Amino acid sequence: MNKFNSQTYFDLIAHCLPDPEFEYKEVVKILLDCYQNKGIVFTMGCGGSASTATHFAADLAKTCGGFKAISLVDNIPLVSAYTNDEGWERVFEGQLENWITENDVLVGFSVHGGNDKWSGNLTKAMQLAKKRGSKIIGFSGFDGGAMKKLADACIVVPTDSEIYGTPVVEAMHVVITHGLVFDLKKVINNERKT
């Protein structure tokens, strides 16, 4: 029997809006610093969060104009080669080894915050970014997981719903990234006018 109810889902979405001071301003600051220093924003995620990572990188590059943004999930031959040759846990870390610097930002999306069972590959990439002096932004849910501890700023969607947790967290991540893009575009356009 399907226990999913769309009205309950929508009610949970409305209830799970994070507090207005939920590190959002810090995320904007980190991304603007990266833009101004001509760094690269690398995004990553597994499962549904992979599509959010790609969507956010595309929005930064196109909508905000001038952002260098790359989704680490998009090069399927490279993702497949790392998975086949070195294991799934190295898929993001391996890609970053040749690229990430102190001017760059790594953005991770994970419903459970980089839980080893589902997405330990995200935390491995974050550990490399930290060693390189890069800033790290996390988007997670539930209690934030390992990502909350590793990130310089982590937006956590508070939920404890077993049935609705994943769709609520994933939906809120997309909503929040759209807000970030709107705010970043406004600041960048104002800077260009001066």
Could you say what each language-model-derived stretch is?
Residues S140-K193:
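Short alpha-helices
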Residues N103-G138, F142-V157:
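C-terminal binding/interaction regions
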Residues P18-N37:
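A short, well-structured juxtamembrane/interface segment
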Residues M1-D19:
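Generic N-terminal amphipathic, Lys/Arg-enriched alpha-helix
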